[in-house]
Amino acid sequence: MRNRNGRGGCDRAGKLLWAAPVFAWAGVAKAAKGSEDLALEEKTQSWNLVLVITLLGVCIFCTYLLLTLGQQGSRARWVRYLPESVVTIMLGVLAGSVLTVSGQTLSNLVTFDPQTFFILMLPPIIFESGYSLQKGDFFGNLGSILVFAVLGTLISTIVVGFGAFILGSVGISYPLTLLDALVFGALISATDPVATLAIFHALDVDQTLYMLVFGESVLNDAVAVVLFRTLMTFYEREHESYSEALVQFVLVSLFSGVVGVIVALFSALVLKLTRLYQHPSLETALMFIFAYLPYLLAEALNLSGIMAILFGGIVMSHYSHFNLSTPSQLTCQQTFRTIALIAETAIFAYMGLSLPTLHHTFHMGFICSGMVLILLGRAFNIFPLAAAINRRERQRHQQAARTSPTALPARISLKEQFIMWFSGLRGAIAFSLVLNMQAHSLTAVSPETKSVLVTTTLVIRMWMC
């Protein structure tokens, strides 16, 4: 019995000895395959960066050509009215078409990482918009701007969301659940009046109108992002009611703004009480850290980093900026603007790249009804709120001057209201949010619905630019 067991043990040992090289070879092959995959991934990422940087360089140089042509002879003056974003998108479409024709391998280089957008691209855009505000005009019209940005965004979201849901239910548009429709309403409510503001600047329009449109767009982006992310949580927590979402939206916005203000005031205090002005490099580096800190801190606290960095930028431009040395002031202003410009250009370029390279699902009923609902939601936003603001202003002037309210002109004229109605263009924020939704692992939303939302948002942005 012992010999048989011993022979069996030797046989098993022999088999293991023969199997050991096989397992070792399999491990080496697997490791080699893993290293090859890693090398291929690194190569793809490198070519992706080369493509992005080259396209950014071409877009920036074309922007320079536009600015140069706009300053020369009357024959080229029309170039001043051509938005830079439109040119960037067109260049992106051209590059995407070349990639598509070149083959599947090259077209796969075009990738979108939502984390890259929310962590690297969006924060500098939002911060710079707050940091570069003309504070006197902004705070002088703050009440009206808040009404249009907060209440107006909510109204637009509700009108577009419920409209898309109802039209889909009766078969006119693409069928969406109420939550899907409201998410679409929230992301499509993010405005981008870059083209309108460029024309405003060229025509030298009224400063109040300019600030209303610009101020609304600054706050609207942050409000739309917070509202979008609040609604996205419903896919994971379906038991919550929409009233709870509204309360969460208000609380998140409020506390996020508080975080941004606290960090900004702390930065102003540090810069004032120290002698960092003797070391401009250290001073500038610390300013950049304080600029980014509200976003990270708010996200760590499960708040809105976008809202925090917006209010941080506004307060830092009012206090921290004037505690910097003169070289650091110039450096910070120019660098913040440069980073925001690069981020905006990258987003618009990717919008153009996406048109020929992404897989699209067109639903003409949803696209056409979406455009109508956007204009309708914008109308329900602008005209009733402008009438309420004008009425309030008349009452205030009447109490102050003791004059008849009919003797006072409306604060926002009907002509200006129509301009504001059509200035709410869909922008890069809307497109980036819908791509984030597509990349999100949501089992409650079908891939077809995600594709329809991406295609519709892209077409609406292209058409209404």
Spans of model-derived segments:
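Transmembrane helical cores of multi-pass secondary ion antiporters/exchangers
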Residues: 2, 12-465
